[in-house]
């Protein structure tokens, strides 16, 4: 019973095929494509792939993208299922004012992070940081309640905003420096410090609220670039959303 997991973000679609819809399943294949190339998945990445027994995904890119992805899966006689944020799932309680409005990728990543800690016997507050097109920082207490989170622009959005609103800032990407002495480094360092500072503020908030410092788990396409500049210790987990999808699938697709 193979299982196909999908993470459809704002920029790329990432997929992973496992030998079963269970936690700890063996990874058989995986890949990623930019959204402009998803109409060729059936003839490229998924060509010749055995038909999965179950498909589960999360999508934040909108209904039009979801329909295009669904069309590519018509090569199989399997109906894909999509995660929608709910009041409770897999041991987590959703503290959002309107739970269904929470981005499904944020919800799935939190489920993956929470169970990653539980598997190691850790019951502590947790921050989940996703660094991609946008940056999100989610706070979860030791009981598994999502307390709330923040959203801020990713590096690319910050730079484009400055370029469009300020004359003379069309410069190459720079490096992160403690004291930048050129515009390229100043822009790159400013964006990096803004993200790192937001995470530190959330660490302070949850530490004050829960009475102990949190574990910090970071994921996303730009997480590896951000990690060296963080002021707090973070654990980098590339597969966090897939881990969350496996946790959900193990409950939804029971034999």
From Swiss-Prot:
Gene3D superfamilies associated with the record: 3.30.420.40
Entry binding sites for substrate: 96, 103-106, 183
Cofactor mode of binding and number, as noted: A monovalent cation. Ammonium or potassium.
Lyase as UniProt keyword: no
SUPFAM superfamilies, A to Z: Actin-like ATPase domain
Catalytic activity, EC: 2.7.1.33
A biological process from GO: coenzyme A biosynthetic process
Pathway annotation: Cofactor biosynthesis; coenzyme A biosynthesis; CoA from (R)-pantothenate: step 1/5
Subunit architecture: Homodimer.
PANTHER family attached to this UniProt entry: TYPE III PANTOTHENATE KINASE
Functional summary from the UniProt entry: Catalyzes the phosphorylation of pantothenate (Pan), the first step in CoA biosynthesis.
Protein name, UniProt field: Type III pantothenate kinase
């Amino acid at each position: 019973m193979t299982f196909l997991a999908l993470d459809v973000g704002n920029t790329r679609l990432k997929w992973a095929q496992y030998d079963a819809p269970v936690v700890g399943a063996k990874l058989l294949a995986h890949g990623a494509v930019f959204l402009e190339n998803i109409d060729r998945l059936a003839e490229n990445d998924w060509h010749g792939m055995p038909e999965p027994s179950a498909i589960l995904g999360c999508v934040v890119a909108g209904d039009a993208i979801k329909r295009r992805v669904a069309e590519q899966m018509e090569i199989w006689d399997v109906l894909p299922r999509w995660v929608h944020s709910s009041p409770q799932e897999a041991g987590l309680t959703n503290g959002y004012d309107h739970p269904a409005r929470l981005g499904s990728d944020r919800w799935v990543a939190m489920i993956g992070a929470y169970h990653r800690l539980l598997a190691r016997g850790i019951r502590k507050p947790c921050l989940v940081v996703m660094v991609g097109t946008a940056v999100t920082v989610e706070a979860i207490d030791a009981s598994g309640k999502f307390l709330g989170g923040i959203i801020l622009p990713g590096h690319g959005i910050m730079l484009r905003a400055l370029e469009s609103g300020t004359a003379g800032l069309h410069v190459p990407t720079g490096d992160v420096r403690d004291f930048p002495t050129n515009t390229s480094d100043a822009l790159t360092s400013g964006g990096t410090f803004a993200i790192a500072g937001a995470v530190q503020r959330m660490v302070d908030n949850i530490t004050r609220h829960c009475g102990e410092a949190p574990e910090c788990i970071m994921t996303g396409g730009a997480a590896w670039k951000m990690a060296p500049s963080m002021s707090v210790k973070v654990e980098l987990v590339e597969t966090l959303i897939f881990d969350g999808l496996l946790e959900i699938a193990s409950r939804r697709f029971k034999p």
